[in-house]
A protein has these predicted regions:
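Class I S-adenosyl-L-methionine-dependent methyltransferase catalytic core
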Residues: 1-205
């Protein structure tokens, strides 16, 4: 019997994110970083406009809109608009802040660790105990410094329904210690406010 030849998947197919990765971050999960960003700028003597890189965001992302409204210089890109974080070099910046694709989480963290750039990435907190992630974080802790967390005191909904998972920010070289932040509600039911990009596109009335 002849050996069946493996067919290589086209490159573009490999880069497509899982549809479940596309969660639009509500604004109050962005604004809750204010105090931490101020402290970061103080510690690092940033006396100019802060440069924030949002690698998984279009111009209508709440990250991009909020940071621009508050005086930061924002560099953003998204694979759907032709800017591929995994293929392109990281631009010069002070901070990387975004809600990355969960299906490629290890690649995201590995690239940022290698670049040495401080970051705050919003993600399911359970991922820290996935074997491949825990090992990556432990090895980086041995090499440089440990991951810290900014943890909301509520499960946050991204679509108006009760959230099934706990999300928070994985931080590296951004905050000095793990902290909890208070949120006024969990963004579900009568408190639900869709991300700007959803409202603008008409996905949510």
């Amino acid at each position: 019997m002849s050996e069946e030849k493996q067919i290589e998947k086209p490159r573009a197919v490999k880069l497509v994110y899982n549809l479940n990765d596309d969660y639009r971050t509500p604004r109050y999960l962005v604004s809750c970083l204010d105090t931490f960003i101020f402290d970061f700028m103080q510690r690092h003597n940033v006396n100019r406009k802060l440069v924030v890189y949002c690698p998984f965001d279009t111009e209508e992302s709440e990250y991009v809109r909020y940071f621009k409204e508050n005086g930061a210089e924002v560099i953003h890109g998204d694979i759907k608009t032709g800017q591929d974080f995994f293929e392109n070099p990281i631009p010069e910046c002070d901070l990387v802040i975004s809600n990355p694709p969960f299906s490629r989480k290890r690649e995201v963290f590995s690239k940022l660790f290698a670049a040495g750039i401080p970051f705050a990435l919003l993600m399911n907190l359970q991922a820290m105990q996935y074997q491949e992630m825990g090992q990556l974080f432990f090895e980086e802790q041995q090499r440089t410094e440990a991951i810290q967390f900014i943890i909301p005191d509520k499960k946050v909904s991204f679509d108006g329904h009760t959230s099934a998972f706990c999300s928070g920010y994985y931080c590296w070289k951004f905050v000095e210690k793990t902290s909890f932040v208070h949120l006024p509600h969990n963004n579900s039911g009568k408190f639900y406010v869709p991300a700007y990009s959803l409202t603008k596109q008409g996905d949510v009335q």
